[in-house]
Amino acid sequence: KDCGEPAYLALRQQHWNCEFETSFIPHFCKESDCAGIAMVQSNENHLRAECYPQDSGVKLVVSLCKDGEDSCLAQMDLPAALPIKLKLRVEGLVASVLYQSNSEWKPVISDIDLRSLSTEHAGGFVGCTLGLYASGNGEDAGGYSDFERMTYRELPTN
């Protein structure tokens, strides 16, 4: 949503059912710094799973931007363990965001309606991208994040 200068490294979504996963270590300096993953159709229509600094560690916020309006779908405190591991699972027009704790993937939120990211709703012809995201949210970012890896894979169709 940051129309300033967010960092976004992405791959085009190539499969109806897929997973995008990353592992990263944030080095936040300001409260406005964030890092995570995103599924982007446009600046006005996208899904973000962002980690923000807080005194006790990291807060994960999942937001859906539809027609330029953000809505917070979920937020939770993450364990202080590093690196942070996030996954976005897409099955058709439904998504889930997960995080890894003690080698186990746990859901943050499931059944996210992605119809607002479709070309039928949002226009365009390219579709969506899935990628690594970092931003200062309109401020000069004081920190950075070390993204260790990103993985995209097709999920089997049921």
Task: Name every feature range the model reports, one short phrase each.
Residues 1-158:
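Extracellular glycan-recognition regions
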